[in-house]
Amino acid sequence: MTDDESESVLSDSHEGSELELPVIQLCGLVEELSYVNSALKTETEMFEKYYAKLEPRDQRPPRLSEIKISAADYAQFRGRRRSKSRTGMDRGVGLTADQKLELVQKEVADMKDDLRHTRANAERDLQHHEAIIEEAEIRWSEVSREVHEFEKDILKAISKKKGSILATQKVMKYIEDMNRRRDNMKEKLRLKNVSLKVQRKKMLLQLRQKEEVSEALHDVDFQQLKIENAQFLETIEARNQELTQLKLSSGNTLQVLNAYKSKLHKAMEIYLNLDKEILLRKELLEKIEKETLQVEEDRAKAEAVNKRLRKQLAEFRAPQVMTYVREKILNADLEKSIRMWERKVEIAEMSLKGHRKAWNRMKITNEQLQADYLAGK
């Protein structure tokens, strides 16, 4: 069944059940038909584009999108299509899937070519604009440099010598030098342009000769080229196989290299741990050596004290018993006398405090009497 027949059957079934369906289903049906119509429209435009490439412009039939008909004509055309679909006469033959696939592939290839041309044009325009920007930057740098030189060489001298003839001559000389340099630059650019034109002519001539030589190739040359192409393809296949083998060997080498790298990483970690442990052991050894030196010093001091004590012990002579008893009794008597004198001193201090208080009272009383006496006079 073709697209026209399916569309006519759908339209008949939709018209027959249009009064029976609710509004929601009608909206869904309209949306579905709109999607189908948009897909068919895109496909029809692609077919018309391909058909337009095959036929000359004067022999092309008008496109469906270019045909402008009224609503009545469209209804009449639709009714005529329905009658044709009902009778089953004059059915058009649709495209097969392979033909549609071929058309789509050609359309995709054309789109890729257009995209490539567009990209090439865009790159060329971009390079052109970049060259213009670069030239503008170069010109701007030259103008800035010339302005700086003019300000440094001319304006400073003019500001110092206003109204003098030397300043005017200097400006004129600067302008003449600038014109001379510009003429020299113009001549260089003209010569370069001439040489570039000559090179362009040579390249065009070589290209034309190559095209003529390529057009003059015969069947024998094409057969030779086919043979060489086959040989090159065999060589490329062999090189691809070698490249595959090299990739496999490279993969194995990378695996071995990764294994050795992991081993090296582990060895480096062990080395770092051992290095840290060696540093800790060295610090511990230095600490032990310091403690050993301190112990040696303490031992030497203890030996010296021990020798001194032994010497004192050897020289020590205990007193006799009676002498010791007498000294002990004398010591006890002295302690008793010390305690007795301490009590006497405390008693004397207390009596001294009492006498001081009495003296202070007497002194205060005397001062009051003197004050009263002086006041009575």
UniProtKB/Swiss-Prot annotation:
It is found in: Cytoplasm, Cytoskeleton, Microtubule organizing center, Centrosome, Centriolar satellite; Cell projection, Cilium. The keyword Lyase does not apply. Keywords: Cell projection, Cilium biogenesis/degradation, Coiled coil, Cytoplasm, Cytoskeleton. One of its GO terms (biological process) is cilium assembly. It comes from the Eukaryota. Residues 95-243, 280-354 form a coiled coil. GO terms for cellular component: axoneme; centriolar satellite; ciliary basal body; protein-containing complex. Forms a complex with CFAP184; the interaction is required for functional activity in cilia. Interacts with HAP1 and PCM1. Belongs to the CFAP263 family. Component of centriolar satellites contributing to primary cilium formation. In complex with CFAP263, acts as a regulator of ciliary beating that connects radial spoke 3 (RS3) to the inner dynein arm (IDA) and the nexin-dynein regulatory complex (N-DRC). The complex is positioned parallel to N-DRC and forms a connection between the arch at the base of RS3, the IDA tail and N-DRC. PANTHER family: COILED-COIL DOMAIN-CONTAINING PROTEIN 113 (PTHR15654:SF2), COILED-COIL DOMAIN-CONTAINING PROTEIN 113-RELATED (PTHR15654). This is Cilia- and flagella-associated protein 263. It comes from Homo sapiens. The lineage of its organism: Eukaryota, Metazoa, Chordata, Craniata, Vertebrata.
